[in-house]
UniProtKB/Swiss-Prot annotation:
GO terms for cellular component: mitochondrion. Residues 1-53 form a transit peptide. Keywords: Mitochondrion, Transit peptide. It comes from Arabidopsis thaliana (Mouse-ear cress). This is Probable inactive uracil-DNA glycosylase, mitochondrial. Probable inactive paralog of AtUNG (AC Q9LIH6) generated by a gene duplication event and subsequently disrupted by at least two transposon insertions. Its main location: mitochondrion. Coiled coil: none annotated. It is found in: Mitochondrion. It comes from the Eukaryota. Belongs to the uracil-DNA glycosylase (UDG) superfamily. UNG family.
Length: 170
């Protein structure tokens, strides 16, 4: 088999679709080419393929050395990461400032205490059974809209913290 032309690593991978290719970014990284031979069973013990590393020269128009270009790009990426950190920290502080309505309102013990209509007995039995096991850490939200809206029961059970709770037979 004939020797193939040396290829760089960039020849094996497609460029990223979202990143913009800048001529300065490709010139700051060394180009690695692999010159491999075809191997048959007899040549397995031979040495691995040769790897040649060449550094690309920066644009003559910029007048910067490759080291200066690499340093400038590094500082550009550091500045961008600091900007992203500032934006993300603002978003996190806003998210921490949001308080759920359930934290502000003392929830009722039984759904019928909130609603002036009778709750389904099966739902109350489930709630009472869980309330015995969990205690005051169990909250229940129960909505019932009228039949004209075609909305059936919406039920939500929320348990605050159940670590260390064990069921005892009584």
């Amino acid at each position: 088999m004939a020797l193939s032309t040396p290829k760089t690593l960039m020849d094996f991978f497609q460029p990223a679709k979202r990143l913009k290719a800048s001529p300065s970014s490709s010139s700051s990284f060394p180009a690695v080419s692999v010159a491999g031979r075809s191997r048959d069973l007899g040549s397995v013990a031979n040495s691995p393929p040769r790897v040649t590393v060449t550094t690309a020269v920066a644009d003559d128009s910029s007048g910067l050395t490759p080291e200066q270009v690499a340093r400038a790009e590094f500082h550009k990426f550091v500045a961008k990461s600091k900007s992203n950190l500032a934006v993300c920290s603002v978003k996190v502080t806003k998210a921490k400032g949001l308080i759920l309505i359930m934290d502000l309102v003392k929830l009722w013990v039984y759904p019928s205490m909130c609603l002036k209509e009778k709750s389904p007995s099966s739902l109350l039995n489930i709630f009472k059974e869980l309330h015995k096991d969990v205690g005051d850490k169990l909250h229940m939200v129960y909505f019932r809209r009228n039949k004209k809206e075609n909305v059936s029961h919406v039920t939500s059970l929320a348990v605050e913290d159940v670590t260390g709770i064990t069921r005892t037979k009584g």
